[in-house]
């Protein structure tokens, strides 16, 4: 390496770093020096500059390799057979290969890490500051039924604006934001848009009924979240929603009294229906054949009904609050009930009112979906102790908790979004980490034997088995 070097460093008082031959005086700057005469400070600065230059070269090389690999993946998606596989991943089909889903989740998380390293900080802030636009634009296209107008196939903006009765310029602006973020697909050559796996689920007749979330998130949840700053202040016990509405009532009671609970109940019911298939296929419920499974806090009954349909020899029961009981009786035990086909295996005497903070109906097996995240640790422990006291010991005895497990990374973002959602709406609302779930189990007479992420669903199946009952349980 040429040992005549000119250094661009304010402390060293040389204007630039260049390789220079002995005796040269490039650009009229100070003469080159011989490295043998450099001070320790000068040598460290020279070394640092070469390291920076070397690091930039390595980063550039790595990024170019990554770019090549990503382009290859994008090209792969265009092959007919591969396109179907990628579409299945996008739909979160419960029958997808778990190994493929696991690899996809790792790639998504890594891609997100790389994005955070490369993306300018102001763009990261912009996503948060202007995030309301995504919600409101999505709500607008749902209200205008744009996904339904595209049900028969792609349309140009001119065609779509005519069929939907919208302004073409503003329709283009809104859809541009959405299709660049994975909702709808755009073809530049024909200047047309079509439904993709995400926008397809927003159609009014789609079985998941995801469209119901658009209105609730853009209005009710958006309003409730405005109470966050005050609710985060030290000493405040109200939830953000209670702060915003200035009430001590629970959100369910408040919305019921104000006539807006129906919309929220429909929204929650849609979420349950959309995720039930993954909850059924993702855990070995068949191990409970010929036994009775009680759904504690069974809500709309969709989970136990789905399990009874999937396992013909399973018996079922539901315990929920007196307020919910009329809805459950209508769902199972009226001539036109939507779950009438399984009513004989969940008779009226096993659809009961109760309070699991007080006591629980005896059974060999229990399932709880989206219940414990509404309670603080003390209350959750009380519920788990009550179930432990009531469980009938047998080879199949267990409690399956269907709740989110907090996780970092892009793939795990639903657990964090859910964490904020229950915190906003419930006074003690919180999701928990795997460590927290294991601690709750250990101090209430349970052992977590497995935690399984369910396909196409937000929660995991946390399998708890009764252990030797400690004195304090």
From Swiss-Prot:
Query: What family does this chain come from, according to its entry?
Result: Belongs to the class I-like SAM-binding methyltransferase superfamily. Cation-independent O-methyltransferase family. COMT subfamily.
Q: Identify the catalytic residues.
A: 373 (proton acceptor)
Q: Answer whether the UniProt record assigns the keyword S-adenosyl-L-methionine to this protein.
A: yes
Give the top-level enzyme category.
Answer: transferase
Residues binding S-adenosyl-L-methionine, per UniProt: 320, 354-356
One example of a Gene Ontology biological process annotation: methylation
Q: In which pathway does it act?
A: Mycotoxin biosynthesis
Query: What's this protein's name?
Result: O-methyltransferase aclU
- For this protein, the Enzyme Commission number is 2.1.1.-
Record-level Gene Ontology MF annotations: O-methyltransferase activity; protein dimerization activity
Could you list this entry's UniProt keywords, alphabetically sorted: Methyltransferase, S-adenosyl-L-methionine, Transferase
Function, in words: O-methyltransferase; part of the gene cluster that mediates the biosynthesis of aspirochlorine (or antibiotic A30641), an unusual halogenated spiro compound with distinctive antifungal properties due to selective inhibition of protein biosynthesis, and which is also active against bacteria, viruses, and murine tumor cells. The non-ribosomal peptide synthetase (NRPS) aclP is responsible the formation of the diketopiperazine (DKP) core from the condensation of 2 phenylalanine residues.
């Amino acid at each position: 390496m040429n040992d005549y070097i000119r250094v661009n460093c304010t402390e060293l008082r040389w204007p630039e770093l260049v390789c220079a031959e002995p005796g040269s005086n490039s650009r009229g700057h100070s003469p080159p020096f011989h490295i043998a005469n450099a001070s320790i400070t000068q040598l460290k600065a020279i070394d640092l500059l070469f390291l920076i230059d070397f690091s930039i070269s390595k980063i550039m090389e790595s990024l170019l390799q990554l770019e090549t690999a990503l382009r290859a993946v994008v090209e792969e998606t265009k092959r007919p057979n591969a396109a179907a596989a990628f579409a299945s991943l996008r739909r979160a089909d419960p029958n997808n290969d778990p190994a493929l889903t696991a690899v996809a989740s790792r790639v998504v998380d890594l891609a997100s890490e790389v994005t955070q390293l490369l993306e300018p900080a102001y763009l990261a802030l912009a996503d948060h500051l202007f995030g309301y636009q995504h919600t409101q634009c999505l709500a607008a296209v749902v209200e205008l039924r744009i996904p339904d107008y595209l049900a028969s196939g792609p349309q140009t903006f001119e065609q779509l604006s005519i069929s939907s009765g919208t302004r073409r310029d503003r329709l283009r602006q809104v859809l541009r934001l959405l299709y660049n973020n994975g909702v709808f697909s755009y073809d530049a050559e024909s200047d047309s848009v079509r439904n993709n796996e995400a926008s397809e689920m927003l159609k009014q007749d789609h079985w998941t009924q995801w469209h119901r979330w658009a209105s609730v998130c853009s209005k009710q949840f958006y309003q409730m979240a405005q109470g966050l700053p005050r609710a985060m202040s030290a000493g405040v016990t109200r939830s953000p929603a209670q702060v915003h509405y200035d009430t001590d009532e629970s959100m369910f009671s408040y919305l019921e009294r104000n006539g807006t609970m129906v919309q929220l109940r429909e929204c929650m019911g849609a979420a349950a229906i959309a995720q039930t298939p993954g909850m059924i296929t993702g855990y070995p419920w068949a191990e409970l054949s010929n036994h009775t499974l009680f759904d504690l806090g069974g809500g709309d009954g969709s989970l136990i009904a789905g399990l009874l349909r999937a396992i013909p020899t399973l018996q079922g029961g539901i315990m929920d609050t007196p307020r919910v009981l009329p809805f459950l009786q209508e769902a199972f035990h009226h001539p036109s009930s939507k779950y009438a086909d399984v009513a004989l295996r969940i008779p009226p005497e096993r659809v009961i009112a109760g309070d699991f903070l007080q006591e629980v109906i005896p059974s060999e097996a229990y399932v709880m979906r989206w219940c414990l995240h509404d309670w603080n640790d003390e209350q959750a422990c009380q519920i788990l102790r009550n179930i432990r006291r009531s469980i009938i010991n047998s080879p199949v005895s267990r409690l399956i908790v269907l709740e989110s497990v907090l996780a970092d990374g892009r793939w795990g973002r639903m657990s964090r979004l859910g964490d904020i959602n229950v915190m906003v709406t419930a006074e003690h609302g919180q999701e928990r980490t795997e460590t927290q779930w294991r601690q709750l189990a250990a101090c209430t007479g349970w052992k977590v034997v497995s935690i399984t992420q369910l396909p196409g669903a937000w929660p995991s199946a946390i399998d708890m088995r009764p252990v030797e009952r400690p004195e304090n349980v």
